[in-house]
């Protein structure tokens, strides 16, 4: 697929930027979003923290408000209240306060060591997954997204590809059309009666 080729370095930066730009000129369809999601999940480094029944609290980013990272702050609050949280995020592509920027400033050392994440869950009720460590395609597009400095369809994909596949998710979006798109996407992915995943 396209994302697998990106992950394997088969396209140069100009070609990848061109692909991203296509979806700035027209809206992405549900089918395209689901296809990209499937490809990213297929390439992910899987992480099993299901014993904690965690929630992911995440926003798409790209709202242009330049606020502090509210979803990451909410993760700390929820974890402090005793609810297990598995946060999946990245450096800001359109802002200075992506989840990874916030975590790094708080001294978090990014890791893909599942045992270390499990210890973090046991001690603090929270584990952080820095997206590029868990998906080669997200790592490959990161500098291109930063260079474009505009909201792209990767803002939409990020919240859908947490490698833990958490049981619950609280998701913030930047506009009503995107909320509707996510609603259709979640309905497609809840045909197995896993109703928690539809609580967008």
What are these regions (language model features)?
Residues 171-185:
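Gly/Ser/Thr-rich active-site loops/lids in small-molecule metabolic enzymes
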Residues 189-196:
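Conserved small/polar residues in nucleotide/adenosyl-binding loops
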Residues 105-120:
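A glycine-rich helix N-cap at a beta->alpha junction
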Residues 92-108:
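Active-site-proximal loop->helix
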Residues 116-172:
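Phosphate/diphosphate-binding glycine-rich loops and adjacent basic-rich segments that engage nucleotide
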Residues 1-67, 81:
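Acidic, glycine/proline-rich low-complexity segments that act as flexible tails and inter-domain linkers
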Residues 19, 103, 158:
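Residue-level signal for inorganic ion chemistry
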Residues 54-96, 154-155, 161:
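Glycine/serine-rich anion-binding loops at beta->alpha junctions
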């Amino acid at each position: 697929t396209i994302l697998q080729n990106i992950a394997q370095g088969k396209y140069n930066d100009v070609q990848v930027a061109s692909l991203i730009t296509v979806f700035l000129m027209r809206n992405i369809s549900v089918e395209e979003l689901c296809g990209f999601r499937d490809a990213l999940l297929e390439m992910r480094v899987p992480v099993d923290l299901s014993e904690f029944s965690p929630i992911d609290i995440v926003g798409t980013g790209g709202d242009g408000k330049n606020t502090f990272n509210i979803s990451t702050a909410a993760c700390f609050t929820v974890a402090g209240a005793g609810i297990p949280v598995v946060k999946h995020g990245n450096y800001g592509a359109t802002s200075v306060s992506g989840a990874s920027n916030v975590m790094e400033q708080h001294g978090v050392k990014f890791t893909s060591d599942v045992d270390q994440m499990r210890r973090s869950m046991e001690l603090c009720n929270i584990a952080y997954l820095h997206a590029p460590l868990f998906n080669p395609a997200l790592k490959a597009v990161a500098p291109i997204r930063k260079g474009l400095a505009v909201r792209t369809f990767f803002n939409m994909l990020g919240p859908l590809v947490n490698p833990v596949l958490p049981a619950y998710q609280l998701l913030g979006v930047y506009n009503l059309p995107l909320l509707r798109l996510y609603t259709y996407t979640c309905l497609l992915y809840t045909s197995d009666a896993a109703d928690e995943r539809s609580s967008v």
